[in-house]
Design a protein with these regions (language model features):
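Acidic, PIN/NYN-like endoribonuclease modules and their adjacent C-terminal/linker elements
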Residues: 1, 94, 98-129
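Alpha-helix capping/helix-boundary segments
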Residues: 9-10, 40, 73, 92-93, ...
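Short, conserved catalytic or interaction motifs in soluble domains
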Residues: 15-16, 66, 117
């Protein structure tokens, strides 16, 4: 797989608010090339929305590989939280990207910059490596 998607990236994609490079990046990860955490599914589907938006979100998520809360992910998330104050969902998403050895595509780069070994890609950047 190419990269790991943060919840905010998926939400921006759903709303069509990513610039063209970000839209192309996310689209390039469809059908087995990118992954997201089960936490992102909870974050994206777990709020009040129209049936149309919910269906669009479910359809989008089905294009990527969902990763679960495996022991290595949980252990890595615990390690991250023991080193610095970080929200549980962010710790799980970062841990998932680390365990699966994928760059994390997120606009919240400031939340993750301190994590050694985690490559970050901002989907709202004008150019994406």
């Amino acid at each position: 797989m190419k990269f790991f998607l943060d919840s905010n990236t998926l939400i921006y994609f759903l709303h069509g608010t990513l610039p063209e490079p970000g839209m192309r990046l996310v689209a390039s990860g469809m059908f087995g090339q990118a992954a997201y955490s089960v936490i992102s599914r909870i974050e994206i589907l777990g709020f009040s929305q129209t049936d149309e938006m919910r269906n669009a979100a479910v359809n989008l998520l089905s294009c990527f590989t969902e990763t679960g809360l495996t022991d290595p992910v949980v252990d890595q998330a615990i390690d991250l939280r023991s080193r610095r104050k970080i929200k549980v969902p962010d710790a799980i998403i970062a841990a998932s990207a680390l365990v699966h050895q994928m760059p994390l595509v997120t606009h919240n780069t400031q939340d993750f910059r301190w994590i050694d070994g985690l490559t970050l890609m901002d989907p709202l950047a004008e150019t994406i490596p």
